[in-house]
Structure formats: structure tokens, C-alpha cells
From Swiss-Prot:
Keywords: Amino-acid biosynthesis, Cysteine biosynthesis, Electron transport, FAD, Flavoprotein, FMN, NADP, Oxidoreductase, Transport. Binds 1 FAD per subunit. It comes from Shewanella sp. (strain MR-4). PANTHER family: NADPH OXIDOREDUCTASE A, NITRIC OXIDE SYNTHASE-RELATED. This is Sulfite reductase [NADPH] flavoprotein alpha-component. FAD binds at residues 324, 358, 392-395, 410-412, 425-428, 604.
Amino acid sequence: MLLKELSSLASPLSQPQVEKLKQLTAELNAVQLAWVSGYLAATANASGNLAQLAPVSDAQAAQTVTILYGSQTGNGRGIAKALAEKAKAQGYSVNLASMGEYNVRQLKQETLLLLVVSTHGEGEAPDDAIELHKFLASKRAPQLNNLHYSVLALGDSSYEFFCQTGKDFDARLSALGAKALLPLVECDVDYEAAAGQWHADVLSAVKPLIQTTANVVALNDTSSALAASESEFTKQNPYSAEVLVSQKITGRGSDRDVRHVEIDLGESGLRYEVGDALGVWFSNNETLVDEILAGLGLAADTKVTVANESISLKQALIEKKELTQLYPGLVKAWAELSASPELLALSEDKEQVRQFILHHQFADLVANYQLKADANLDANKLVELLRPLTPRLYSIASSQSEVDTEVHLTVALVEDEHQGQARFGGASHFLASAEEGAEVKVYVEPNKHFRLPEDPQTPVIMIGPGTGVAPFRAFMQERVAQGAEGDSWLFFGNPHFEQDFLYQTEWQQYLKNGDLTRIDVAFSRDQAHKIYVQHRIKEQGQTLWQWLQNGAHLYICGDAERMAKDVHQALLGVAVEFGGLSSEAAEEYFETLRSHKRYQKDVY
């Protein structure tokens, strides 16, 4: 029966091949058929060419759940992959792909579409979702009256444009006539429970609309990042690594504490590419936890339940709960618990909340806004109020071509002062305080959107002020190992030359050896008027434009809030002044570079 259906569908097999397949399968028992099925699936997966399959026919599309993900980090990919596996287990035929690898012309043939998408920057689509996002917003987007869909949006509520890209997809699909299986699901940084519930709900919603095909399941995973060779060590199962070095690399007179951290990956087998990030799990500072407990009058040894585990309240606050990053929901909840008129008024103003959380931590709420008498905040209610601790991502500052089983980071200690009280970033303080031999739980977070050119002859322009220089240290190590002959140009900036020139001797050695073609620096406080990297870009605009015309790849790493925007504006100015482009054409020019992977950003 199945082979008869195969010959009538848009099969990639010729009729003689179908006949041969019939002859072979007729001679096999059930066990042998199962073995052949697995063998063929593995062979197809290993070929790496699944993305090139011809579009499915309408008959096939009606039997297929298409799951697309767009995510700057691996969170969206992980959620989508887990959903695909659950759908497969229930007998559904599944097409799983990154939005960046999806053929938008296939959209009008889809009948069941499940999207997982994050939001990047100020409400922007992540890199691999940009094309689909633009297509749906364009006049080319078709009517989708036959489509049922659901969107899971990932975001961080501490940012203004929370889950904006997911909202965009949901609104646009609805406007094009598609029918929502479920209301839009918006997930904060503690997304696991909500994502798991969405898995269950959306598969239940899909069930009446599709026939299961348990014997013919095609999991078309077009992402190499989901290969079977993935490390066993993940965000959920990190590797316990050893800290080898945590060395301050800013001068004694610097107002910044930046550390060069070296971590031993030992025999973990963890591999990373230059451009990837390292996920770091950390523990909250014990002194900070003691301050919070004292402020709330709660006993440290009180038993609480976290993720079905009974532990002491103090252990929960040190190991399990987020204390150093506020978010709007917590500010609003604390305003109600404290009944503070000041905090209640502030919590209703999004911009005021956004500014407040930049310079306050949970301990500041406890210290400055006392609970009202009937708040009844006991130990278990406290741990329910606080969201789970999440790892921090750091751009990797090394290449395994040079450091082998080590991984290097460039970590700026996050430090703020409020009413005379110093507050530190959770992960940065943990790493800065780590002594040689200390244990840290880590995993590799791939970043396929920040990669060196495949051809080592290609010139590269690297713009990385402050700790944004980290991945470019890795780039240079990799280029030297490759014997790259392509030119390389670094723009670096920090407050002071004598105190803040990160990895100065390494850059000088690269210049001396001819591995680094040129470096332009901007030390903002070494003269009366402030000079930043964007000023150096403008000064060197003619040369920079010539490099771009010669095929250079352009990279930016560092602060997304100000630096990346200012640098982008400077680049637009270069295109206008030295390329003779209009403002609109300049934007289109850099958008074309981005789509060809010649303009890449790692900003945060």
C-alpha cells in the first residue's frame, strides 16, 4: 500500500527505482524492514543534502507538520527540536528547519506551521528569521487561508520590546488569513515550563487536523547544528570545568576590572568554533544572600521546594534563583507586596521600570521597600516569586587551534553603586572571584551568525571596543593557524591607553608578524574631547570603503545599546560619502552584505 502511494506522490525516485524497492521489501520481514528504515534514515541524514529536497506536494503537505525556528542563541532551536521529537513519537510527519534555511515560496503550500522565534536587539528579528519576517511583511506574501499555525515567542521582559518578533509573526499570519491553533505564547528567560506546556497544547490542537503516519515519518532536519555528533554537555547538562586563570588585564589606575579567564575543558570532548559563546552557570554571592535573608527576616535553613527538590532557603537563593537581574514582573509584584506609593507609581511606567532595573538588584528592593504588614511572604512564596537562575553567555576569546582543550573568556566585572552600596553582576563576580582550581559549570553555545569567511584569503574588518574584542582574539588565533593571507583590520576602543588596552602585547605581536594588517584605536578619555571607534571609522572611511569593495567581511562585537548603533551610523556615512550612495541605498547595501554573511554582529 505504502509503495503504491509512493509512486503516485512527488517522489524523488524513478519508476524503475520504485520497482526495485518493491522487490527488496517484499523479501524482508518486519525486523529487517525496521533495520533498513533506520539505515536509510541515517544515510540520508549523513549526506547533509536534505535541505535540497524538492518541495512537497499538496498531498504530502497536508500530512506534514512544519516546525521552523529563528533564534540568535540555541534556545529556540532546542525548543523546536524537542517539539519535533515529540511530534515524531506521536506518528506525525515532521519538517524541521531553521527559518534561514526555509524556502519562503513553500509557505503557500503549508497547512500546519509551528514557529519558535526569539527577539533580538530592539524588537528585531534574529538573523536567521530576517528573510521570512521581511517576506511576510511584504506585498509578495500570499494569502494563507488553508494554514493553521501557532507561534511561541521567546524574549526577556526586562527589555522594552518583549517578544516583539513573535508578535509580528502572529499578527502577520493572522492578517494573511491563517488560523491560529492557540493564542500567541510569550516566554520570558525562564521559558522551560511554558515551552513544555506549549508542546502539549499545540500537539493536541494539531491532532484533529492530521492523520498520523507512524510508519512513514520524515524528520527533515536541515540544520547541521542538530547533528548527532552534538556534545553530551548542554545547557541542561553542563560540564564541570576547572578554572586555570582569572587574571586582571586592566591597570591599577583603571576604573574597570576586566579579567582574562582560562578554563580547562579536560576530557569533556567539548569543541567550539571561533565566534561561539560559552554558557556559564554561576552561584550567587553568599554575602548577598545573607543580606537578603536578614532584610526579610527569614531563616537560612528553612526548607523550600524548588523543581521538586527539598533544599534549604539559603541554598536555593545561592544556586537556584536569580538575584542580580531585575525584571518588570518582579518590580510590579514587589510594589504590590510593599504598597510603596513610589514603587507602585514607577511600576506603571515602562520607561521608568526599564531605567530602574538597570541600576538595581533584588537586594535593593528588599532594603528600600519594606513589605507591608499583611504581605505574608514566607520562604516558599519567596522562591516562587523569584525566577530561576539562568546562565550567562560570554563570547569565546580563543581558538582550539591554539589552546586545544582550553577556552578563554574576557570578562568585565559588572559593578554598580546605589546609595553607597556596591552591587556586582552575578556571573562576572563569580568568575572574577574564582581561584585557580575552582569549578565552573559550562557548555558551548554555537553562534553560526558570527563566523570567519570560509576562504582565508578574504580580508576581515573587526570592530570590537572594550570586551567586544574577545572574539577577535579568537579570530586572529584561528587565522594564524590557517596561515591566512587575507588582510585583517582591528578597530579597538576603551577609556585609557595605559590602563585599558586589552591584550595590547598580543596585537602588537600580530602587527609585527604581519598577521594583523592594521589597527586603529580610540581611547576616549586620553584627550579633552571624547573619541570612540565610530570616529576612527569616519576618519578611515575611504580606506574602509575600498576594503569593502575588495570583498572584506565586516564584524561588530560589543554593546548593542549604543556602540553598535553608532558604528552602524558611521558605516552608513562611509557608504554615502565615499560610495556615493543615498541614505536609502546605503541601508540596502549593508543589508545585502548581511544577507551574504559579510556583515555580522555579536552584540548584547
